[in-house]
UniProtKB/Swiss-Prot annotation:
Keywords noted in UniProt: Antibiotic, Antimicrobial, Defensin, Disulfide bond, Immunity, Innate immunity, Secreted, Signal
Keyword presence, RNA-binding: no
Source species taxonomy: Eukaryota, Metazoa, Ecdysozoa, Arthropoda, Hexapoda
Source species: Formica aquilonia (Red wood ant)
Name of the protein: Defensin
Subcellular compartments: Secreted
Record-stated family: Belongs to the invertebrate defensin family. Type 1 subfamily.
PROSITE patterns registered for this protein in UniProt: INVERT_DEFENSINS
Keyword Disulfide bond: yes
Signal peptide (UniProt feature, chain positions): 1-17
Domain of life, per lineage: Eukaryota
GO process annotations (BP): defense response to Gram-negative bacterium; defense response to Gram-positive bacterium; humoral immune response; innate immune response
Matches recorded under InterPro entries: Defensin_invertebrate/fungal, Scorpion_toxin-like_sf
SUPFAM superfamilies in alphabetical order: Scorpion toxin-like
């Protein structure tokens, strides 16, 4: 058993030592002729504006009949004087 462990250690040491190269030797760099890569040409795309309408207070709470009251409470919490739900079920706050 000792012989097997010793042989395994020797094989491991040799396997680790084999890939070592001389650090002082000049490095050979083989570069392929480079073509201009088309994928690196990036185009600037215009930023699209994202418009998000708040529909929770008017759309989901309309089934319970509290849509206008919930919209008014929502607007009061935002510091406005009140609000109402329009025909598109979007909460519109007063100034």
């Amino acid at each position: 058993m000792k012989n097997y462990v010793f042989a395994l250690l020797v094989v491991t040491a040799v396997a680790i030592a084999l890939p070592n190269e001389d650090k002082n030797a000049p490095m050979r760099v083989h570069l392929l002729p480079q073509k201009e890569d088309e994928s690196l040409k990036l185009e600037v795309t215009p930023v699209k504006e994202h418009h998000r309408t708040r529909r929770f207070t008017c759309d989901l709470l309309s089934g319970a009949g509290v849509d206008h009251s919930a919209c008014a409470a929502h607007c009061i919490l935002r510091g406005k004087t009140g609000g109402r739900c329009n025909s598109d079920r979007v909460c519109v706050c007063r100034a």
